Regions:
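Interhelical loop and helix-boundary elements at the membrane-water interface
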Residues: 1-13, 43-61, 65-128, 133-193
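Short, hydrophobic transmembrane alpha-helix segments
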Residues: 18-30, 44-49
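Central hydrophobic cores of alpha-helical transmembrane segments in multi-pass inner-membrane proteins
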Residues: 35-43
Length: 208
């Protein structure tokens, strides 16, 4: 098992239980946790970007993203679903990319491959199957489409953050997680996935 895979798994093992702990600790603690994460992510974005319009756009988006993060995770099952799909997409993409390699997906993020993209979809759909079994719910076409959409958005989020890191000529967005980089490095897909799912929820197309 490579160091990078261990890094991704350990990040998930730490971040998901930590998030769930603050959810169950009560609304005050969860709000506090959300604000701290927002401030850390905003600081990393500020350090990474140079142009004022990028900074303002990023701050505005992060504010909306963490609002949807909080709103989604007040519903335990919704929060778990989005987190699960993002983690599965990240790990599936890494595993398939390393095993099957193949053509690069984009020059912006040279480690991304088409095989990795397929792997992200594959593991996210496997995760959907287990999730729906857990909540005793059949997989509908809407849930299938939502999973594919979230996986796609998560991968796009990864590429977008990689683009700005490339512009700034940095490898990681920060050093807050020892050996793992910054918070944005770990949640790059999630900050795009949560707003997406929030909009899907507002549309009322997913039955539970």
């Amino acid at each position: 098992m490579s160091k990078e895979l261990i890094k991704r798994i350990l990040s998930s093992i730490i971040l998901i239980p930590l998030t769930l702990y603050f959810i169950f600790a009560g609304s005050f603690y969860f709000i506090f946790f959300t604000i701290i994460c927002f401030l850390v992510a905003s600081y990393e974005w500020h350090k990474m970007t140079k142009k004022l319009n990028y900074k303002l756009l990023g701050f505005t988006f992060l504010l909306f993203s963490f609002f949807t993060f909080y709103e989604s995770l007040t519903d335990f099952y919704v929060g778990i679903f989005v987190l699960l799909i993002c983690v599965a997409t990240d790990i599936g993409g890494y595993l398939f990319g390393k095993i099957f390699k193949g053509p690069k997906l984009t020059k912006i993020s040279p480690n991304k491959t088409y095989s990795g993209m397929v792997g992200g979809y594959f593991l996210s759909l496997i995760s959907l199957s287990y999730f729906m079994s857990w909540i005793n719910h059949e997989i509908s076409i809407n849930w299938f489409i939502a999973t594919i959409l979230l996986s796609t958005i998560s991968q796009i989020g990864d590429i977008i953050i990689s683009y700005f890191k490339r512009l700034s000529k940095i490898k990681n967005t920060g050093k807050i997680i020892p050996g793992h980089g910054g918070l944005l490095d770990r949640i790059d897909g999630m900050i795009f996935a949560f707003p997406t799912f929030y909009i899907i929820e507002l549309m009322g197309v997913l039955s539970r």
